[in-house]
Amino acid sequence: MTSRSTEKSAAANPAAVSKTPSPDRIRRAPKVLLHDHLDGGLRPGTIVELARETGYGDLPETDADLLGTWFRQAADSGSLERYLETFSHTVGVMQTRDALVRVAAECAEDLAEDGVVYAEVRYAPEQHLEKGLTLEEVVEAVNEGFREGERRARDNGHRIRVGALLTAMRHAARSLEIAELANRYRDLGVVGFDIAGAEAGYPPTRHLDAFEYLKRENNHFTIHAGEAFGLPSIWQALQWCGADRLGHGVRIIDDIQVHEDGSVKLGRLASYVRDKRIPLELCPSSNLQTGAADSYAEHPIGLLRRLHFRATVNTDNRLMSHTSMSREFEHLVEAFGYTLDDMQWFSVNAMKSAFIPFDERLAMINDVIKPGYAELKSEWLFQQTASTSGSSESDG
C-alpha cells in the first residue's frame, strides 16, 4: 500500500550544508515540545538518590553513569520486556510527593536549558499511588514542580512554560476518572488528556466514555495512535474518538504512495489528516527504537514535512532514547539538510497545535519563536558576510 520515501541528506545537498545550523544554534533556537513523558525523562543521578531516599531497592545499577548506560541499552535491546522494565524503575522512585515535585522541577529546568520555550509533559497519575498519594495529590505535586522549575529556569536566564497532560493507561479502566481529573485541573496547570500504553488489543474505542465526556466539557485530548498498530488506530482515534492530535501518528505513512517518478498519492485517511491539519507528534529517535524507521534519513518525517502535514518534532522519552529536543533536530539536520527555516517551521507548527488559548499561542509565536529565529538567522548571516569579506581581502 505504501512506498517509503528517503529524503536527501545534507551530505547529498551541498547547497544546504553552508546553511546548516551548528549544535550551539540548534540548542539556542526556541523549540516547542508536545510529546514528552515525565517518567521517561529523569536524570540518572536523581533516580539513584530517590531510590535511596524512598527505599526503592530494585535498581539494576546504583552508579548514575552506569544506570544511564543501562537505560539506553535496555531501550535499544529490541526486547519489549526490557524496555518496559525501564519504566518500572522510574515510576518506582516517583511514589512520594517530594519525589514528584523534584522530578517535575528538574524536567522543566532541563527542557529550558535545552532551549525549549513551551512544553506539554504527560504522565499517568494512576501510576503514582503505591505509597498512599491520592490522584489529586499527584497532580498538585507535579504542578508545583513545574512551577518551581519554571522559576529556576528564569533565574538562570531561560524562559519556559510547561503544561501537564494527564494520561490514562489503555489497559486499565480509569480513563473516565482521569479525564474528570484533567477537567478539574484544566485552569490549574493541566492543559489536556491522553491515553497511552500498548495499542494492540487495547483500541482507543475502549475509552469512548472518557473522550465523549471531554468533548462535552470542551476540553483537549491527544491519543497515542499510529506508533505500532498502524492505520486502524489512527482512524479510530480520529473518527471514533475525536482526537485533537495524534501521539506519534507516524504510521500515516502507510497511506501514502510514492511512485518511481517521485509523484505522491495520498489515501483517504492521509488526505484527511493533512487537510484537517491534524498535528502529528512525531518522535524520531523513539521511532527508531520501536522499528517505525530504520534510520533518521528514512524516517517518514522527511516526506511528511515536504507534503506539508502538521508535523512536529518531539522527544518521547529523553532518558530511554538518550535524547533532547536539540539532539532530535541535530539528527534531522544531518539527515535532511534542514536549516533554521525548517526548525522554525516545526516549532511554529507545534505552537499552533498546543492546548492553550489561541491568543497565548499567537503571542508565543510572534513574541518568542519568530524573534528568536530571526536573531539566529541574522547572527548566521553576519558571520557568513564577515567570512566572505575576510576571504576576499585575503585573495586580494
Curated annotation (Swiss-Prot):
InterPro entries cross-referenced by the UniProt entry: A_deaminase (IPR028893), A_deaminase_dom (IPR001365), Ado/ade_deaminase (IPR006330), Metal_Hydrolase (IPR032466)
Cofactor(s) for this UniProt protein: Zn(2+)
Catalysed reaction, written as an equation: adenosine + H2O + H(+) = inosine + NH4(+); 2'-deoxyadenosine + H2O + H(+) = 2'-deoxyinosine + NH4(+)
Residue positions binding substrate: 37, 39, 197
UniProt-listed Enzyme Commission number(s): 3.5.4.4
Alphabetic keyword roster: Hydrolase, Metal-binding, Nucleotide metabolism, Zinc
GO MF, any single term: adenosine deaminase activity
Region Disordered, annotated ranges: 1-26
UniProt remark on cofactor binding: Binds 1 zinc ion per subunit.
Enzyme class, first EC level, given as a word: hydrolase
Regulation: Coformycin and 2'-deoxycoformycin, whose structures mimic the transition state of the deamination reaction, are potent competitive inhibitors.
Residues the record lists as binding Zn(2+): 35, 37, 224, 316
Cellular component terms (Gene Ontology): cytosol
Active site: residue positions: 227 (proton donor)
Coiled-coil spans in chain: none
Site (Important for catalytic activity): 248
Cited Pfam families: A_deaminase
GO process terms (BP): adenosine catabolic process; hypoxanthine salvage; inosine biosynthetic process; nucleotide metabolic process; purine ribonucleoside monophosphate biosynthetic process
Family under the similarity heading: Belongs to the metallo-dependent hydrolases superfamily. Adenosine and AMP deaminases family. Adenosine deaminase subfamily.
Annotated HAMAP family: A_deaminase
Purpose: Catalyzes the hydrolytic deamination of adenosine and 2-deoxyadenosine.
Subunit structure: Homotetramer.
Protein name: Adenosine deaminase 1
Organism: Streptomyces coelicolor (strain ATCC BAA-471 / A3(2) / M145)
Gene: add1
